[in-house]
Amino acid sequence: MHLVGTVETGVGAASRSLAPLLSIIREASSLKDLQPATLNVRLSSPYVLRPTFTIFGSEVGRDEDFHFEVCSIHDLKRVRAFLGVIMRTSTNYHGDDVLEVMAEVNLRERMGLADGSSVELSLFD
């Protein structure tokens, strides 16, 4: 499955919220250099996450659960892709039409993205 969306600025809460959980997320995803920042991608229609793994808030002293789906993010200008995860909390602050994407690189910098840039993601069955 492929999703296409537009990059937009987030509120910065994910980086602060995910930093203490980063070692758990890295272990569960096998992405050893995963960065705590997320890239917000707005879709034209809602997407219901199909979690690859979940970190339950009750197990890490949090009020919400953290759901993750493995994906790849495509840099169409340079014909390459980065493995990553889509993160969504159980409270789903942004709604189903925004994805928060994490990767082992800063996606904005590495892919030369700005607000309004188009991004393609591939999801695995």
Regions found by a protein language model. Give the residues of each.
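Long, compositionally biased stretches
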Residues: M1-G95, D115, V119-L121
